[in-house]
């Protein structure tokens, strides 16, 4: 809003803010930052409409892979989260430099009609349910009793007393 009041951005300019998937999905350890990122994404949509109509300024957010930044390092279990995202993402985690390159495209004329979007830059993590690599890791961490006990949660049907 300050940029708008001071008329600091040219027509067809672009504003990009960094977000994270925890704004939309629960991720252990992200806590209050998830709420802040959700608010940021909402502001980008709401204010994107206003600034877009007035000066064709585009406002977007980018949800980046977990990245060891100053803020990111404050997240409980960041290393584990990075390892999990790496195992889930078909293309692997995007680095901070990869993200910077991507954001540059959002400042270019190549994306003149992209606005009010949260764009994922996470190697495909946001679209995954479970990868084979993550499933293998998960299975190795289970005890046989855990698997056997929960394999037939409603009984096997073999025992008449079940």
Locate the predicted segments by residue.
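C-terminal helical subdomain
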Residues: 61, 79-114, 119-123, 143-162
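Short, small/polar-rich loop/turn modules that mediate ligand/substrate recognition or access, typified
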Residues: 12, 53-58, 114-116
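Short beta-loop-alpha junction of Rossmann-like oxidoreductase domains
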Residues: 65-77, 130
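A short, polar/charged loop-to-alpha-helix boundary motif
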Residues: 129-139
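Intrinsically disordered, low-complexity Ser/Thr- and acidic-rich flexible linkers and loops
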Residues: 7-9, 138-144
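Generic structural signal for alpha-helix termini and adjacent loop/cap motifs
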Residues: 1, 5, 50, 108-112, ...
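Hydrophobic positions on the long internal alpha-helix
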Residues: 1-2, 43-44, 102, 106
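Catalytic loop of short-chain dehydrogenase/reductase
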Residues: 4-53, 64-68, 92, 125
């Amino acid at each position: 809003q300050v940029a708008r009041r001071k008329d600091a951005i040219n027509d067809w300019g672009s504003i990009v803010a960094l977000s994270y998937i925890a704004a939309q999905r629960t991720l252990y350890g992200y806590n209050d930052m998830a709420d802040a990122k959700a608010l940021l994404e909402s502001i980008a949509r709401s204010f994107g409409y206003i600034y877009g109509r007035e000066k064709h300024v585009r406002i977007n957010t980018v949800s980046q892979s977990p990245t060891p930044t100053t803020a990111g390092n404050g997240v409980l279990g960041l290393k584990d989260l990075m390892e999990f995202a790496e195992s889930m993402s078909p293309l692997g985690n995007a680095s901070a430099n990869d993200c910077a390159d991507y954001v540059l495209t959002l400042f270019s004329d190549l994306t003149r009609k992209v606005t009010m979007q949260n764009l994922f830059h996470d190697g495909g993590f946001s679209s995954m349910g479970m990868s084979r690599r993550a499933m293998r890791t998960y299975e190795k961490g289970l005890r046989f009793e855990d698997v056997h006990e929960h394999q037939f949660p409603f009984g096997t049907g073999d025992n008449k007393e079940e």
